[in-house]
UniProtKB/Swiss-Prot annotation:
CDD domains: ADK. Residues 30-59 are annotated as: NMP. The keyword NADP does not apply. This is Adenylate kinase. Pfam families: ADK, ADK_lid. Catalyzes the reversible transfer of the terminal phosphate group between ATP and AMP. Plays an important role in cellular energy homeostasis and in adenine nucleotide metabolism. It is an enzyme of class 2 (transferase). Belongs to the adenylate kinase family. Its EC number is 2.7.4.3. GO terms for biological process: AMP salvage.
Length: 214
């Protein structure tokens, strides 16, 4: 079972990815993790990627496709894999198809932007322990204070509203077109495309996912 998970940052992809991995025994392939592992292992592609990253440049699509092909040939991908954070753009999706990497299921978790802003900008973190709160969904007992230590809570830079909106804008510009792209691929019978309402409870989304991935 080869799966691509699409959705904006903060849509709840990570939680559902965890569910899919546990349920179906397939690994999650994140391009970031994959790059770090290849660099650490010192593979030819890893060394090439390191050179590019050390120069502060973006790793090319060709290089990433090479790494994906290398990674999915490993034993733990025998039953399939879950691609996370890739492809991000239509040229990457085209390159995957050109390299014979077929996908069984494309899953989109859809959450309106305003809901994502509310979710993410409401997060508060206790820097010392990593405990996470939310001003609406999981508030601390005392506003702005950690339940255990009473110390101040902080907002991660990634969760600040301006940053969240910027990341959403990039998602809509680069990745959202993939929704249409895979819709056409599915219409041609080459993959299955399903969209889920990510504003539902985690359990409800997981249940619907399971019924589609049977």
């Amino acid at each position: 079972m080869r799966i691509i998970l699409l959705g904006a940052p903060g849509a709840g992809k990570g939680t559902q990815a965890q569910f899919i991995m546990e349920q179906y025994g397939i690994p999650q392939i994140s391009t970031g993790d994959m790059l770090r592992a290849a660099v650490k292992a010192g593979t030819p592609l890893g060394l090439e990627a390191k050179k590019v990253m050390d120069a502060g440049q973006l790793v090319s699509d060709d290089l990433i496709i090479g790494l994906v092909k290398e990674r999915i040939a490993q034993d733990d991908c025998a039953k399939g894999f879950l691609l996370d954070g890739f492809p991000r753009t239509i040229p990457q999706a085209d390159a995957m198809a050109a390299n014979g990497i077929s996908i069984d299921h494309v899953i989109e978790i859809d959450v309106p932007d305003e809901e994502i802003v509310k979710r993410m900008s409401g997060r508060r973190v206790h820097p010392g322990s990593g405990r996470v709160y939310h001003v609406v969904f999981n508030p601390p007992k005392v506003e702005g204070k950690d339940d255990v230590t009473g110390e101040d809570l902080a907002i991660r830079p990634d969760d600040e509203e301006a940053t969240v909106r910027k990341r959403l804008a990039i998602y809509h510009e680069q990745t959202k077109p993939l929704v249409e792209y895979y819709g056409k691929v599915a219409a041609a019978g080459q993959t299955k495309y399903n969209k889920f309402d990510g504003t539902q409870s985690v359990a409800a989304v997981s249940e619907q996912l399971a019924s589609v991935l049977k």
